[in-house]
From Swiss-Prot:
<dbReference type="InterPro" id="IPR033693">
    <property type="entry name" value="PGPEP1_Glu_AS"/>
</dbReference>
<comment type="function">
    <text>Removes 5-oxoproline from various penultimate amino acid residues except L-proline.</text>
</comment>
<keyword id="KW-0645">Protease</keyword>
<dbReference type="InterPro" id="IPR033694">
    <property type="entry name" value="PGPEP1_Cys_AS"/>
</dbReference>
<protein>
    <recommendedName>
        <fullName>Pyrrolidone-carboxylate peptidase</fullName>
        <ecNumber>3.4.19.3</ecNumber>
    </recommendedName>
</protein>
<keyword id="KW-0788">Thiol protease</keyword>
<feature type="active site">
    <location>
        <position position="141"/>
    </location>
</feature>
<comment type="similarity">
    <text>Belongs to the peptidase C15 family.</text>
</comment>
<dbReference type="InterPro" id="IPR029762">
    <property type="entry name" value="PGP-I_bact-type"/>
</dbReference>
<dbReference type="InterPro" id="IPR016125">
    <property type="entry name" value="Peptidase_C15-like"/>
</dbReference>
<dbReference type="GO" id="GO:0005829">
    <property type="term" value="C:cytosol"/>
</dbReference>
<feature type="active site">
    <location>
        <position position="165"/>
    </location>
</feature>
<dbReference type="InterPro" id="IPR036440">
    <property type="entry name" value="Peptidase_C15-like_sf"/>
</dbReference>
<dbReference type="GO" id="GO:0016920">
    <property type="term" value="F:pyroglutamyl-peptidase activity"/>
</dbReference>
<dbReference type="Pfam" id="PF01470">
    <property type="entry name" value="Peptidase_C15"/>
</dbReference>
<dbReference type="GO" id="GO:0006508">
    <property type="term" value="P:proteolysis"/>
</dbReference>
<keyword id="KW-0963">Cytoplasm</keyword>
Length: 213
């Protein structure tokens, strides 16, 4: 089995992006699956193109994209991506789209086909906090997830894929004292256990979850 794992470059004035820093620290193999690491630009459209190129090149069985969500308290795996670009800040190419679809005539939204409950439970079983998120935002993280799932739903039906958000690193919050952070080691371990569960689990487990707001 091959798993492509992508991580973004720094954006929004940050000098580092914990997403790719953690991806780089993953081992070359997890649960018998080859881990292929790819850095992608924080740019609308281009990030999805890089995923398409990685799929063409490596022919993976699974693609997991990883991005930074400053302000989140823990690693979160995303349930859904929506067909909308709404950028509060410019991307790394200076684009700042507002209220435009990511794919003309594309589906309104796509659900991940990863076993996200099993992924979260595997983190909990190893004493690591983790959660399911029901919004990937409207910036490039949602963009890459939507384009990945669009490819899966229209061209690569046997591939499983989805997106994981990670918090700031402690050094990123020195001037943001109210923001949560997580060590690079803990983020990397969380990614490892999420990927391990995704590789080992075909049918997701039954586990009560959800949010009230």
């Amino acid at each position: 089995m091959k798993v492509v794992v992508t991580g973004f470059d720094p954006f929004g004035g940050e000098a580092i992006n914990p997403a790719f820093e953690a991806v780089k620290k993953l081992p070359a193999e997890i649960a018998g699956a080859e881990i292929i690491k790819v850095e992608v630009p924080t740019v609308f459209g281009t990030s999805g193109e890089k995923v398409a190129e990685a799929i063409e090149t490596h022919q993976p069985d699974m693609v997991i994209c990883v991005g930074q969500a400053g302000g989140r308290e823990t690693v979160t795996v995303e349930k859904v991506a929506i067909n909308l670009a709404e950028a509060r800040i410019p991307d790394n190419a200076g684009q700042q789209p507002s209220d435009v679809p990511l794919v003309e005539d594309g589906a309104t939204a796509y659900f991940t086909n990863l076993p996200i409950k099993a992924m979260v439970k595997n983190c909990h079983d190893h004493q690591l906090p983790a959660a399911i998120s029901y919004t990937a935002g409207t910036f490039v993280c949602n963009d890459i997830m939507y384009h990945l799932l669009h490819l899966i739903n229209t061209k690569y039906p046997t591939i499983r894929g989805g997106f994981i958000h990670v918090p700031f690193l402690p050094e990123q919050t020195i001037d943001k004292p109210t923001f949560a952070s997580m060590s690079l080691e803990a983020i990397t371990d969380s990614l490892f256990y999420m990927i391990e569960a995704a590789v080992k689990t075909q049918e997701d487990i039954q586990l009560q979850g959800g949010t009230t707001h």
